[in-house]
């Protein structure tokens, strides 16, 4: 279960995910030098809007994709605060795939099929050259997002190009204890729309 994991924050202190029981969570593998880095702005807007209602964002920077999260934890946190006003929790830099994969991510990847929009297939085709040898459930790029309900269930996985604004409607439903429905498009056998 999600709440069984203990992770390191940006200051290398242990944080039990059980601290987030009863909250709606968005877990993301961020990066400071990626084309999707401006999503930090949208993420912060979601946080500002919904944090008072029990919403949290957990950012786990990863340098695995073209080394787009260079620098120390302190530098990454400083960059995000300075450029995007990030106030949500940022954790220690991790690997999301492979031999040194963070156990939390090993778990997350088994819990939900990825929601993709129409541009995702084209994006993944372009990224193939940079990510050879990935397993079917592996994270494909920075800013893959996992949405977690108040009970700790991973209810959705969103591709990197799915924006925070596209996820907002699902956050609202989970905060109201409504179920969300992710519609799988028949043209996408490897994902949902």
Predicted segment positions?
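Extracytoplasmic/secreted proteins, especially bacterial periplasmic and envelope-associated proteins
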Residues: 42-45, 75, 99, 103, ...
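A cross-taxon signal for low-complexity, glycine/charged-rich
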Residues: 190-193
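N-terminal "domain-start" segment that seeds a small globular fold
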Residues: 1-18, 36-38, 115
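Conserved helix-turn-beta segment immediately C-terminal to the redox Cys motif
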Residues: 23-25, 32-61, 80-84
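Non-catalytic, surface beta->alpha helical segment in thiol-disulfide oxidoreductase systems
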Residues: 155-179
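Thiol-based oxidoreductase modules, predominantly thioredoxin-like and allied folds used
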Residues: 53-71, 87-98
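Thiol/selenol-based redox catalytic cores and closely related redox-interacting motifs
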Residues: 79-81, 85-161
């Amino acid at each position: 279960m999600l709440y069984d994991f203990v992770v390191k924050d940006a200051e290398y202190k242990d944080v039990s995910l059980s601290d987030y029981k009863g909250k709606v969570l968005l877990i993301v593998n961020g990066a400071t030098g990626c084309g999707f880095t401006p999503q930090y702005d949208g993420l912060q807007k979601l946080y500002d809007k919904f944090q008072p209602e029990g919403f949290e964002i957990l950012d786990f920077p990863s340098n695995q994709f073209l080394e787009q999260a260079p620098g120390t934890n302190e530098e990454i946190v400083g960059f995000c605060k300075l450029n995007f006003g990030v106030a949500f929790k940022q954790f220690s830099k991790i690997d999301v795939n492979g031999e040194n994969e963070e156990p939390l991510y090993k778990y997350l990847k088994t819990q939900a099929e990825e929601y993709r929009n129409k541009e995702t297939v084209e994006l993944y085709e372009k990224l193939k050259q940079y990510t050879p040898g990935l397993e079917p459930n592996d994270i494909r790029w920075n800013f893959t997002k996992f949405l977690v309900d108040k009970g700790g269930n991973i209810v959705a996985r969103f591709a990197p190009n799915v924006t925070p604004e596209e996820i907002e409607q699902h956050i609202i439903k989970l905060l109201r204890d409504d179920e969300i429905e992710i519609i799988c498009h028949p043209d996408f056998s490897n994902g949902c729309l």
